[in-house]
Amino acid sequence: MGRNSQGFLTTIRIIVTSATDQPSNFIHSLSNKRESTMRQIAFYGKGGIGKSTTSQNTIAALAETNRIMIVGCDPKADSTRLMLHTKAQTTILHLAAERGTVEDIELEEVLLEGYQGVKCVESGGPEPGVGCAGRGIITAINFLEEEGAYEDLDFVSYDVLGDVVCGGFAMPIREGKAQEIYIVTSGEMMAMYAANNIARGILKYAHTGGVRLGGLICNSRNVNCEAELIEELARRLGTQMIHFVPRSKQVQEAELRRMTVIEYSPDHPQAQEYRELSRKIENNTNLVIPTPITMEELEELLVDFGILGGEDEYEKALQADKAATKA
């Protein structure tokens, strides 16, 4: 073998040695970042169920190891307040209304950096009784895409009102923006009713947009047999209860300070619950097309678990009311 060949082998040895001198976790980290693709998830749920609180605490935990942007898609504009420690963020729709067009908005005016470097945006909504709140979502997402806000991210999280899945609120589902939907619910009838309706919306667009249901998150209201009830609802919807979040006063303590539990009390057991939920979402591969149930099936489920009374109990209650009225 000639000198040139020996020099070539020496060069190879230097390159290999340089690579192996790096810590294995450094190489693994670089490899993961190269191979990773941005995941777009969405949290849907009935108004008042604790959707925004649950999503922000989960994202705060997820942000410990990932680059994330939150896009608030609720007219209340409360999807980012715990990340930013503020009452409400200026919304895209509000600025667009002030200036007459979204084209006069600068990205820095509506995209703020919060806890753990999470990027925060609120789509906003119109004045009560005027226009469609869902249009704010469409305007916001189009604006963010055009301005390059989706670059260099591991996750985008949409926080969406879910009492009704109308055209505007279904936009992240319909247009395939969010590929994974997580429904925040509880053992209360209306929360479960909303969850089933959201599952219907996912089913409608699953074959055209590729959206899938990632699971139900039970944000506990201390209803009897709540975990078992939501597990059964999840089974009937063809999905999983991905996590049961216990009720804790620590959540309210943190909210009073406009903080997530992850930031306010990172070592508290409730913070560990959100970390566990974030870990399950990060590793989740159980993404399904849901199988919504009928209203009759939902009521039967609630009767079986003692949340609703059966027909006999209903009639007895009516008779008792009549007797009390006569007396």
Curated annotation (Swiss-Prot):
Cofactor binding, per record: Binds 1 [4Fe-4S] cluster per dimer.
A GO molecular-function descriptor: ATP binding
Binding-site list for [4Fe-4S] cluster: 132, 166
Pfam family membership, one: Fer4_NifH
Residue positions binding ATP: 45-52
Region annotation PEST-like: where it falls in the sequence: 1-37
Gene Ontology biological process terms, A to Z: nitrogen fixation
CDD domains according to UniProt: NifH
Domain of life: Bacteria
Cofactor requirement: [4Fe-4S] cluster
PTM section of the record: The reversible ADP-ribosylation of Arg-135 inactivates the nitrogenase reductase and regulates nitrogenase activity.
Gene3D superfamilies, per the entry: P-loop containing nucleotide triphosphate hydrolases
Annotated positions of the ADP-ribosylarginine modification: 135
Catalytic activity entry: N2 + 8 reduced [2Fe-2S]-[ferredoxin] + 16 ATP + 16 H2O = H2 + 8 oxidized [2Fe-2S]-[ferredoxin] + 2 NH4(+) + 16 ADP + 16 phosphate + 6 H(+)
EC number: 1.18.6.1
Keyword terms: 4Fe-4S, ADP-ribosylation, ATP-binding, Iron, Iron-sulfur, Metal-binding, Nitrogen fixation, Nucleotide-binding, Oxidoreductase
PROSITE patterns the UniProt entry points to: NIFH_FRXC_1 (PS00746), NIFH_FRXC_2 (PS00692), NIFH_FRXC_3 (PS51026)
PANTHER family: LIGHT-INDEPENDENT PROTOCHLOROPHYLLIDE REDUCTASE IRON-SULFUR ATP-BINDING PROTEIN
Function summary: The key enzymatic reactions in nitrogen fixation are catalyzed by the nitrogenase complex, which has 2 components: the iron protein and the molybdenum-iron protein.
Quaternary structure, from the entry: Homodimer.
Family: Belongs to the NifH/BchL/ChlL family.
Name this polypeptide is given: Nitrogenase iron protein
Species, as recorded: Crocosphaera subtropica (strain ATCC 51142 / BH68)
Gene: nifH
